[in-house]
Design a protein with these regions (language model features):
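Glycine-rich and polybasic anion-binding loops at the starts of cofactor/ligand-binding domains
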Residues: 1-192
Length: 192
């Protein structure tokens, strides 16, 4: 956790929020089969394996993402939690920001904030993702396809956040797709 905070992927004013989320996660722990909503879910792989938190340089150039591309969409590619601008075709009406840039402009208010273990982990360990803003009175002509690809030979844990601001009298269709070619575990959160 301390390594994540030291990376400075987020404004330092958010460190207190992240530390509180991590402390609360440590108190709650991972769900067990005794939890009603988790009684049929095997999470033992989380404790049986070692995971490394993804870094910005974990974006492989050797991924054939064309098999995941959806025709007639604007595709935003995120590899191992990090936005790959050079592989993306964002429409000109879309203002794409890093989460750092976005959170410098906005207050970090999680919509429908939940204190579940995976939400708390995402809040505390998030160091990647993408944010985009659609200005007022804007219509995006084709769906926005957010393609999350997990790849690599290492066991990575990825906790990206996607922040979407669609302003008044604007419209867009957003499709999120997840593809994994590795043992990577993703704990994504989308805020609209």
């Amino acid at each position: 956790f301390n390594k994540i905070i030291a990376r400075k992927y987020f404004p330092s004013r958010l460190n207190n929020t992240r530390q509180k989320a991590f402390s609360k996660f440590l108190d709650i722990g991972l769900p067990t089969k005794k939890w009603e909503n988790w009684r049929y879910t095997d999470l033992s792989f989380l404790t049986k394996n070692n995971f490394r938190i993804s870094e910005a340089n974990d974006t492989s150039e050797n991924i054939d993402f064309s098999k995941y591309k959806i025709k007639n969409t604007h595709t935003l590619v995120i590899i191992n939690g990090h936005y790959a601008e050079h592989l993306s075709d964002a429409p000109k009406e879309l203002k794409v920001l890093t989460n750092y840039e976005y959170l410098e402009q906005k207050d970090w208010k999680q919509k429908d904030k939940k204190d579940t273990p995976f939400d708390l982990l995402n809040t505390s360990l998030c160091d990647s993702g993408i944010s985009f803003i659609i200005e007022p009175d804007t219509v995006i002509d084709k769906p926005i396809h957010i393609l999350f690809i997990c790849s690599g030979s290492e066991n990575l844990i990825i906790s990206p956040q996607v922040n979407i601001d669609i302003n008044r009298s604007s419209s867009a269709t957003v499709i999120e797709q997840y593809a994994s070619e590795s043992q990577t575990r993703s704990n994504d959160q989308t805020n609209r």
